[in-house]
Amino acid sequence: MLLILCLVAFRNLRADPVKWGTTTTVAPGGWGRMAALTNGNWLAVSTVFPAGTNSYLSILISSNSCRNWTAIARVQVAGRTLDNGELVVLPNGNILLTMRSLIGTTSFLLPVYVSADQGRTWTYLSNIDSSSGPGGLWEPDFLVLTSTLAVFYSNEAHPGFSQLISEKISTDGGTNWGAEIWAVAQNGGGSLRPGMPQIVRMANGNYILVFEVVNSGNADVSYKISSDATTWAGGLGTHIPCQHCGPFVTAVASGIVFLTSCENQVSFSRDFGATWQRLETPPWNLGFNFSWPALYNTGSNELAAMVTWGGVNLRFGNLVPLAPWPNPFADNFNGGTDTNWTRYDGNFGFASGTYLLNDAGTNGKALTGSEFWADGTLETDLLISTPGNAGVVFRMTNPDYTGPDAGFDYYAGLDTGGFMVFGIQSNAWSQLATTPMTVAINTTYHLKIVMQGSLFKLYAVDMNTPKVTWTNSTFARGQIGVRAFQCNASFDNVSFTNAVPTRLNVAATNGQLTFTWPFAPVNVKLYSATNLQSPLLGSPVAISPSLVNTQWTLPVQQPAASRQYYWLQGR
């Protein structure tokens, strides 16, 4: 009998898969977008705003991986204002350019131009849509499908809808356009304004459409998923945390999806949009500004972040191999840093080897670990120095900085009112349990949370008898972190042991083992060993999983040994 133990244990991958580096200027104008040509060059479009006349589009080319740019053409129409340029390269090598073209509030067009000579000359081809106002047409975005071409755009021309996102399909390379499809619209109409659409095909074959929703928060960013890029669920999609206004999305071959917006932060998803994390280091330190950013996969291991700020500029980043999270994970903050932690709101500091959350009158949290951690034991030493409550979060996904309960997670903490509290945060607070205990100010308490499936045991001071035992299955996986609510608190000796992510599944048929797992295999290998050691030591058995029905799948020959261990490990 063959005994197969699938660990996947602790070998999940550390955050920030991009290391930002050099910058370059593309053009002195505004609103930049790019496209990769079939010969390896890149083409860019930028808006030029000359004094005393209407704006026009400048076309630029780079032959050295986007480092240097030369203007080669312009597209200009007398009496019309042009902006929001968008490029796409067709399978036959032709390049299409679309844009918004308007005369005040009386004429709106989305014209299409074609170039057959690498962008040096342009010929009018067609018009996607038109409006005589006052509702306008804005921000077109192309998508090449298997045998057709799609375009998405913001549309103000429908009565009863402040704005919606329209889609049209061309079956002849942009010469003619089919009937309008409503990709995103407020159910029943109203004042909400979905717009600025961007779409990309992910590594699992599905398409993700991202967009802003003006009059919802600060132009909150949301997304929809489609298997064919033409069939869309109703409504306004699913919110993406930490991003607002003017989103842009791209996907890389490894499976990671990257997203940015006018927050000028970059978020990434390793599970095709189900959960999102924010990079600790942004490409540009602009804060929230109307920079109309974009992201491009400019090389096999390179991501470029484009912003319009003092001209159109690019910053290049290396897609770096992600180091494995250690098991156990531990941080005592003795170095006076919180490397590998991501801060959300709040005020942070360090003193005497402790992590300070100085949040009297406010709130804040800091997160670390893998978004795929599921079971394990979380511990910390906690001292609260002003009235309020503080504690730990776990199984957190989609964290945001828009309030004390922004994210999806469990929270266990101590309150100086004299109790331990356990609850759920899902952009709102839902209390599960409390138990009375003495919580004195300026006194250190040791907390321990043991999580196994839907069972949670919460310990404080006494590590033998849990103060709270509770069953709840709301959240299955996520990061860990520390949180302070309306108080100053310090944390020390944070640890997470026996970390287990979502399961590595295995099926055995006809002498073959087939492993599947639901997240992106970025720089990982499947490892195997006949004996367990600490740390795990083994040999790689394969490196090239494939996508089958949204699961990463990797077949290997059934081993001869009677006992075999398998796990995923960072390269």
Language model regions located:
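Hydrophobic core segments of beta-strands in well-ordered, beta-rich domains
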Residues: 33-51, 84-104, 111, 139-161, ...
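Asp-box/BNR beta-propeller loop motif
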Residues: 16-22, 60-72, 113-126, 169-181, ...
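Extracellular glycan-recognition surfaces and repeat-rich motifs
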Residues: 334-366
